[in-house]
Design a protein with these regions (language model features):
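Short boundary/linker motifs that mark transitions into or out of structured domains
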Residues: 130-140, 216, 224
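The C-terminal output helix
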Residues: 114-127, 166
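Positively charged, aromatic-enriched patches within helix-turn-helix-type DNA-binding elements
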Residues: 140, 145-208, 214
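A short linear beta-strand->loop->alpha-helix hinge motif most characteristic
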Residues: 208-224
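Short amphipathic alpha-helical/adjacent loop interface patches that line ligand
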Residues: 24, 109-112, 136, 178, ...
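N-terminal/domain-start alpha-helical segments
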Residues: 1-119
Length: 224
Protein backbone atom coordinates (compact mmCIF):
# COMPACT_ATOMS: atom_id res chain seq x y z
CA UNK A 1 0.00 0.00 0.00
CA UNK A 2 1.38 3.34 -1.09
CA UNK A 3 1.10 6.30 1.29
CA UNK A 4 1.92 10.01 0.93
CA UNK A 5 2.75 11.89 4.14
CA UNK A 6 2.80 15.70 3.97
CA UNK A 7 4.21 17.05 7.25
CA UNK A 8 6.47 20.08 7.73
CA UNK A 9 7.87 18.90 11.09
CA UNK A 10 10.85 16.92 9.80
CA UNK A 11 11.32 14.74 12.88
CA UNK A 12 7.64 13.78 12.93
CA UNK A 13 7.63 13.10 9.18
CA UNK A 14 10.66 10.81 9.55
CA UNK A 15 9.15 9.00 12.55
CA UNK A 16 5.87 8.42 10.71
CA UNK A 17 7.70 7.21 7.61
CA UNK A 18 9.64 4.62 9.63
CA UNK A 19 6.49 3.55 11.50
CA UNK A 20 4.38 3.01 8.39
CA UNK A 21 7.20 1.28 6.50
CA UNK A 22 7.53 -1.19 9.37
CA UNK A 23 3.82 -1.87 8.88
CA UNK A 24 4.19 -2.73 5.19
CA UNK A 25 3.41 0.65 3.62
CA UNK A 26 5.49 2.22 0.87
CA UNK A 27 5.87 5.86 1.93
CA UNK A 28 6.76 9.13 0.23
CA UNK A 29 7.19 12.11 2.58
CA UNK A 30 7.07 15.80 1.59
CA UNK A 31 7.37 18.88 3.77
CA UNK A 32 5.36 21.65 2.14
CA UNK A 33 1.97 22.09 0.55
CA UNK A 34 3.22 22.66 -3.00
CA UNK A 35 5.03 19.31 -3.04
CA UNK A 36 2.04 17.64 -1.37
CA UNK A 37 -0.15 18.79 -4.24
CA UNK A 38 2.36 17.80 -6.93
CA UNK A 39 2.75 14.30 -5.51
CA UNK A 40 -0.90 13.81 -4.58
CA UNK A 41 -2.36 14.85 -7.93
CA UNK A 42 -0.55 11.93 -9.59
CA UNK A 43 -3.19 9.57 -8.19
CA UNK A 44 -0.52 6.97 -7.38
CA UNK A 45 -1.33 6.71 -3.67
CA UNK A 46 -3.75 4.52 -1.74
CA UNK A 47 -4.00 7.17 1.01
CA UNK A 48 -2.67 10.63 1.89
CA UNK A 49 -1.91 12.13 5.31
CA UNK A 50 -1.95 15.96 5.22
CA UNK A 51 -0.78 18.30 7.95
CA UNK A 52 -3.05 21.32 8.29
CA UNK A 53 -0.29 23.93 8.68
CA UNK A 54 2.43 23.77 6.01
CA UNK A 55 4.52 26.35 4.12
CA UNK A 56 3.72 27.35 0.53
CA UNK A 57 0.18 25.96 0.74
CA UNK A 58 -1.76 24.84 3.79
CA UNK A 59 -3.44 21.47 4.10
CA UNK A 60 -6.93 22.77 3.34
CA UNK A 61 -5.72 24.46 0.15
CA UNK A 62 -3.97 21.25 -0.94
CA UNK A 63 -7.09 19.23 -0.16
CA UNK A 64 -9.37 21.59 -2.07
CA UNK A 65 -7.10 21.58 -5.13
CA UNK A 66 -6.77 17.79 -5.14
CA UNK A 67 -10.53 17.32 -4.94
CA UNK A 68 -11.03 19.96 -7.65
CA UNK A 69 -8.72 17.91 -9.88
CA UNK A 70 -10.88 14.84 -9.28
CA UNK A 71 -8.44 13.04 -6.98
CA UNK A 72 -10.50 10.57 -4.93
CA UNK A 73 -7.64 9.22 -2.79
CA UNK A 74 -8.65 8.93 0.90
CA UNK A 75 -7.15 11.84 2.85
CA UNK A 76 -6.47 12.12 6.59
CA UNK A 77 -5.90 15.58 8.08
CA UNK A 78 -3.42 16.11 10.94
CA UNK A 79 -3.34 19.33 12.89
CA UNK A 80 -2.40 20.90 16.19
CA UNK A 81 -5.74 22.67 16.06
CA UNK A 82 -8.59 20.88 17.80
CA UNK A 83 -11.43 23.36 17.32
CA UNK A 84 -14.70 22.11 15.88
CA UNK A 85 -14.58 24.78 13.18
CA UNK A 86 -11.29 23.41 11.83
CA UNK A 87 -12.70 19.89 11.65
CA UNK A 88 -15.79 21.12 9.84
CA UNK A 89 -13.64 23.09 7.38
CA UNK A 90 -11.54 20.00 6.66
CA UNK A 91 -14.50 17.71 6.15
CA UNK A 92 -16.27 20.27 3.96
CA UNK A 93 -13.14 20.51 1.80
CA UNK A 94 -13.19 16.74 1.23
CA UNK A 95 -11.20 15.14 4.06
CA UNK A 96 -12.09 11.54 4.92
CA UNK A 97 -10.85 11.69 8.51
CA UNK A 98 -9.23 14.05 10.98
CA UNK A 99 -6.80 13.50 13.87
CA UNK A 100 -5.52 16.27 16.20
CA UNK A 101 -1.95 16.35 17.51
CA UNK A 102 -0.53 14.90 19.64
CA UNK A 103 -1.72 11.44 18.64
CA UNK A 104 -0.86 7.79 19.18
CA UNK A 105 0.73 6.26 16.04
CA UNK A 106 -1.30 3.09 16.61
CA UNK A 107 -4.51 5.11 16.45
CA UNK A 108 -3.30 6.85 13.30
CA UNK A 109 -2.56 3.62 11.44
CA UNK A 110 -5.86 2.12 12.62
CA UNK A 111 -7.70 5.13 11.24
CA UNK A 112 -5.76 4.96 7.95
CA UNK A 113 -6.63 1.28 7.54
CA UNK A 114 -10.29 1.98 8.30
CA UNK A 115 -10.21 4.81 5.77
CA UNK A 116 -8.78 2.43 3.18
CA UNK A 117 -11.48 -0.15 3.86
CA UNK A 118 -14.13 2.48 3.22
CA UNK A 119 -12.49 3.54 -0.01
CA UNK A 120 -13.60 2.03 -3.31
CA UNK A 121 -9.98 2.13 -4.46
CA UNK A 122 -8.82 -0.18 -1.65
CA UNK A 123 -7.87 -3.65 -2.90
CA UNK A 124 -7.14 -6.03 -0.03
CA UNK A 125 -6.85 -9.10 -2.26
CA UNK A 126 -3.66 -11.11 -2.66
CA UNK A 127 -1.20 -10.21 -5.40
CA UNK A 128 -0.33 -13.20 -7.58
CA UNK A 129 2.22 -14.20 -10.20
CA UNK A 130 2.61 -17.82 -11.29
CA UNK A 131 2.77 -20.03 -8.20
CA UNK A 132 3.51 -17.04 -5.95
CA UNK A 133 1.21 -14.85 -3.83
CA UNK A 134 1.92 -11.78 -1.72
CA UNK A 135 -0.44 -10.44 0.93
CA UNK A 136 -0.05 -6.62 0.91
CA UNK A 137 -1.59 -6.34 4.37
CA UNK A 138 0.77 -8.73 6.16
CA UNK A 139 3.81 -9.04 3.87
CA UNK A 140 3.33 -12.83 3.65
CA UNK A 141 5.00 -14.31 0.55
CA UNK A 142 3.71 -17.79 -0.23
CA UNK A 143 4.28 -20.64 -2.68
CA UNK A 144 2.06 -23.67 -2.08
CA UNK A 145 2.29 -24.58 1.60
CA UNK A 146 5.59 -22.74 2.14
CA UNK A 147 5.68 -19.10 3.15
CA UNK A 148 7.80 -16.39 4.71
CA UNK A 149 7.14 -12.85 5.81
CA UNK A 150 8.85 -9.96 4.06
CA UNK A 151 9.51 -6.67 5.77
CA UNK A 152 10.97 -3.26 5.05
CA UNK A 153 12.48 -2.57 1.64
CA UNK A 154 12.26 -6.19 0.49
CA UNK A 155 8.49 -6.13 0.91
CA UNK A 156 8.21 -2.78 -0.88
CA UNK A 157 10.30 -4.00 -3.83
CA UNK A 158 8.38 -7.27 -4.13
CA UNK A 159 5.06 -5.44 -3.97
CA UNK A 160 6.24 -3.13 -6.77
CA UNK A 161 7.04 -6.10 -9.01
CA UNK A 162 3.93 -8.10 -8.05
CA UNK A 163 1.67 -5.19 -9.01
CA UNK A 164 3.32 -4.97 -12.46
CA UNK A 165 4.68 -8.49 -13.18
CA UNK A 166 5.41 -7.85 -16.87
CA UNK A 167 7.12 -4.51 -16.39
CA UNK A 168 10.88 -3.97 -16.40
CA UNK A 169 12.13 -1.65 -13.64
CA UNK A 170 15.60 -0.14 -13.73
CA UNK A 171 17.65 -0.02 -10.54
CA UNK A 172 17.38 3.77 -10.68
CA UNK A 173 13.59 3.62 -10.88
CA UNK A 174 13.43 1.21 -7.94
CA UNK A 175 15.75 3.53 -6.01
CA UNK A 176 13.48 6.51 -6.65
CA UNK A 177 10.23 4.68 -5.86
CA UNK A 178 11.40 2.89 -2.71
CA UNK A 179 14.12 5.10 -1.22
CA UNK A 180 13.27 8.47 -2.76
CA UNK A 181 15.63 10.92 -4.42
CA UNK A 182 16.51 12.63 -1.16
CA UNK A 183 17.90 9.46 0.42
CA UNK A 184 21.67 9.07 0.71
CA UNK A 185 21.62 5.31 0.03
CA UNK A 186 23.83 4.00 -2.79
CA UNK A 187 22.42 2.18 -5.83
CA UNK A 188 24.01 -1.07 -4.69
CA UNK A 189 21.37 -1.37 -1.96
CA UNK A 190 18.93 -2.18 -4.78
CA UNK A 191 21.18 -4.99 -6.02
CA UNK A 192 21.56 -6.37 -2.50
CA UNK A 193 17.80 -6.42 -1.93
CA UNK A 194 17.17 -8.03 -5.33
CA UNK A 195 19.74 -10.72 -4.52
CA UNK A 196 18.11 -11.38 -1.14
CA UNK A 197 14.68 -11.64 -2.73
CA UNK A 198 15.93 -14.14 -5.31
CA UNK A 199 17.27 -16.33 -2.50
CA UNK A 200 13.98 -16.12 -0.63
CA UNK A 201 11.97 -17.00 -3.73
CA UNK A 202 14.19 -20.03 -4.20
CA UNK A 203 13.90 -21.00 -0.52
CA UNK A 204 10.10 -21.33 -0.74
CA UNK A 205 10.35 -23.34 -3.96
CA UNK A 206 8.77 -20.81 -6.31
CA UNK A 207 9.26 -20.93 -10.08
CA UNK A 208 9.04 -17.14 -10.07
CA UNK A 209 12.28 -15.18 -10.07
CA UNK A 210 13.55 -11.64 -10.54
CA UNK A 211 15.27 -11.74 -13.92
CA UNK A 212 17.88 -9.20 -14.97
CA UNK A 213 17.45 -7.68 -18.44
CA UNK A 214 20.92 -6.52 -19.38
CA UNK A 215 21.07 -2.75 -19.67
CA UNK A 216 17.37 -2.36 -18.84
CA UNK A 217 16.64 -3.55 -15.31
CA UNK A 218 14.67 -6.31 -13.64
CA UNK A 219 11.33 -8.02 -14.17
CA UNK A 220 9.31 -10.65 -12.36
CA UNK A 221 9.36 -13.83 -14.45
CA UNK A 222 7.37 -17.05 -14.08
CA UNK A 223 9.86 -19.65 -15.34
CA UNK A 224 7.31 -22.31 -16.29
Amino acid sequence: MRLLIAEDELDLAEALTVFFERNHFTVDAVHNGADAYDYGVSGEYDAIILDMMMPKMNGIQVLERLRAEGVKTPIMMLTAKGQKEDRITGFDAGADDYLPKPFDPDELITRVRAMLRRSQSYQPSLLACGDLTLDPASGLLQCGDTSLRLGGREFQIMELFMRSPRQVFSAEHIMERIWGWDNEAEINVVWVNISNLRKKLKSIGSRVTLRANRGLGYELEDAT
